[in-house]
Amino acid sequence: MSGRGKQGGKARAKAKSRSSRAGLQFPVGRVHRLLRKGNYAERVGAGAPVYLAAVLEYLTAEILELAGNAARDNKKTRIIPRHLQLAVRNDEELNKLLGGVTIAQGGVLPNIQAVLLPKKTESHKPGKNK
């Protein structure tokens, strides 16, 4: 009989996601699928979704860290859109990157023009004018 013999072959290894292989939290498989379905190019390389997922994860972590700092400065434990707005607009590089982006319920940065501020008057001290 030509059988397979004993099933002493190697057991199949546990499946490991591409995200965990790359050490990422963002889904590499989903990014790959979106790149393929988005008609950006005829073919998509294996490294492209890993790189893009890593960039997206880094930018998200950067914004969330700054927004968390803004929330802590306002003595809040929950990040709201206002904190995201303050985080992005107070950071020079993120503000340039997201210059054309409107954050809903974000408000505006507090800013008063210098000409509108009250003028500081010189106080007359005795003994100075002679």
Curated annotation (Swiss-Prot):
| Disordered as annotated region, ranges | 1-22
Q: Which residues carry this modification: N6-crotonyllysine?
A: 37, 119-120
Tell me which stretches of the chain form a coiled coil: none
Q: Which residues carry this modification: N6-lactoyllysine?
A: 10
Claim: Nucleus is one of the keywords in the record = yes
Alphabetically list the UniProt keywords.
Answer: Acetylation, Chromosome, Citrullination, DNA-binding, Hydroxylation, Isopeptide bond, Methylation, Nucleosome core, Nucleus, Phosphoprotein, Ubl conjugation
Q: Which residues carry this modification: N6-glutaryllysine?
A: 96, 119-120
Q: Where is this cross-link: Glycyl lysine isopeptide (Lys-Gly) (interchain with G-Cter in ubiquitin)?
A: 14, 16, 120
* SUPFAM superfamilies, per database record: Histone-fold (SSF47113)
Biased composition of type Basic residues is found at: 7-19
- In this UniProt entry, the residues modified to Symmetric dimethylarginine are 4
**Which Pfam families does this entry report, sorted A to Z?**
Histone (PF00125), Histone_H2A_C (PF16211)
Q: Where in the cell is it found?
A: Nucleus; Chromosome
Q: Extract the GO molecular function terms from the UniProt entry.
A: DNA binding; protein heterodimerization activity; structural constituent of chromatin
GO BP: any one term:
heterochromatin formation
Record-stated family: Belongs to the histone H2A family.
* Positions where Citrulline occurs in the chain: 4
Q: How does it assemble?
A: The nucleosome is a histone octamer containing two molecules each of H2A, H2B, H3 and H4 assembled in one H3-H4 heterotetramer and two H2A-H2B heterodimers. The octamer wraps approximately 147 bp of DNA.
Name the record gives this protein: Histone H2A type 2-B
Modified positions (Phosphoserine) in chain numbering = 2
- Phosphothreonine occurs at which residues? 121
Q: State the PANTHER family in the record.
A: HISTONE H2A
Q: What does this protein do?
A: Core component of nucleosome. Nucleosomes wrap and compact DNA into chromatin, limiting DNA accessibility to the cellular machineries which require DNA as a template. Histones thereby play a central role in transcription regulation, DNA repair, DNA replication and chromosomal stability. DNA accessibility is regulated via a complex set of post-translational modifications of histones, also called histone code, and nucleosome remodeling.
Q: Which residues carry this modification: N6-(beta-hydroxybutyryl)lysine?
A: 10, 14, 37, 96, 119
Q: Does the keyword Isomerase apply?
A: no
